[in-house]
Amino acid sequence: MTGNRRLAAALLAVLVCALTTTSPVGAITAPDWSGLDARDYAGPIPSAGDVIAAVPLNPALSVRGAGEAFRILYATVDQHAEPAVSTAAVFTPRTAPPPGGWPVVAWAHGTVGLGDDCTPSALPRSARDDEYLTHWLDQGYVVVGTDYAGLGTPGLMSYLNSTAEAHSVVDSVRAVHHLDLPLSPKWAIIGQSQGGGAAVNSAWWADRLTAGAGLDYRGVVATGTPANIERVFARAGPDLPPRQTPPAAISYTSYILAALREAHPELGIDKVLTPRGRELADAAQSLCKPALDQRVGTTTLNDLFSAPVGSLPGIDAALDSFMGTPTEGYSRPIFLGQGLLDSDVPPLSTQTLYQQLTDNHQDVELHIYPDQDHSGTVIASMPDSTRFLQRVMAG
């Protein structure tokens, strides 16, 4: 049992560190809403995928490869299966659209925090993400990057909620097709790390949520993709060895706790949390990641829990529905990229997901980058993922 607990602690610490995608921009920047502040939006909500408002994005928040850039407010569905709104950034290529229009890629962002001040479309992009998104613009794709419902809009962003994130991603694609842009019906999904998980889940929902919309979903690119986190998280508790854990791991755990507690109040998550655990889960609702990392200090994983997470009735089913990733039922090809030097998402995590998908006869390919770490895989994978998208778009 002691060995298993040590393994659970190690896996939890490593896997929760996997959930970051965007490199820190640096000093905390006040959000710029580009004239579209939807934090307290209380107007009517139309059908999912409909655009409510669209404005030019402040050029300071654009990426260097964009021709035009917009910030949009659109309708979607939240973690409670209720109508909700989300915002997104939209970037168009500098080149003229081809016959039939530009295809679209939906970008699933990584961990920034749950507070409105963390909203990606209201902040400058990191250098890495600027390079990555510019690459796809240079390839002739329109890029739409959702913020996810609750981030810069009413409600709490449901962190790692597979279905809620999928709705935000897929509905952003439906929304961009309501803009006055020359678009092809073909579209794909791209994402890294926590956003890679969101991308794969969005791929499962893609055709299901766009049936009858005239769209043509073609495939997904996901790098550094965590999988099966729900199984590891269920083993968290006070009996984990009191090892020093990077603050980021505690921050990600706190984000999970805050989101799970909000989505499933019937579980009584607070019953297995210490006062310190409740304090950090509360703080996670508003603090962006750099600030939450500072608040964490020297807290360890076992400091958060007064009882095992697995002792909560119904927790396994709730975790599976909340953050589980389907391993069958995908309609289009899947690209998984993984760096062997990745210390955030262990290669075994992506390899396990690949094996699960392969066992279920899904169309999936795994690309390994021996000399790349977690973040480096994003850029290193571009030649392979570019060829992948060219192939599936042409199919």
Question: For each predicted feature, which ranges?
Answer:
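Primarily recognizes the serine-hydrolase "nucleophile elbow" in alpha/beta-hydrolase
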Residues: 174-246
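Alpha/beta-hydrolase active-site loop
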Residues: 159-180
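C-terminal catalytic histidine-bearing segment of alpha/beta-hydrolase fold enzymes
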Residues: 308-318, 344, 351-395
